[in-house]
Amino acid sequence: MGIHIVLYQPLIPANTGNIARSCAGTGVSLHLIKPLGFSTDDKMLKRAGLDYWEHVDIHYHDGLDELFRAYPNGNYHYITKFGTKTYSSFDFSDPQEDYFFVFGQETKGLPRELIDANLDRCLRIPMNEHIRSLNLSNTAAILMYEALRQQGFPELS
């Protein structure tokens, strides 16, 4: 049971490294959906994650279907600017639940068919019209800490 960050085919190694570092510091699991837009030996990935990689609970999946089969009872939430509800309107407070926050590629987001099939589980982070999107690692941190806040920051000081 816990909180899971899922990156669907991430492209920018520094974003993934920053997210991995946040996961290491919070006990949140990280799932990477292949294909990745970089090598896991990438210098920028390693640099962004610093020397915390041994503390990251990281999982690799060949596709979203593989993730869904591995965690059939997961409580999946899809982060997209097309979400009709904001992240703060969702309840992530049950520590016995597995919450999966699924993020799309930095350039394209999530596949439209996935969004359309899960509109009731799509959430957004409010922003003004001056930008197309927020940075992926910042967005992941917002969701990660909102779920942790709702659960009383378990095992964190």
Describe these PLM feature segments.
Residues M1-S157:
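Post-transcriptional modification and biogenesis factors for structured RNAs
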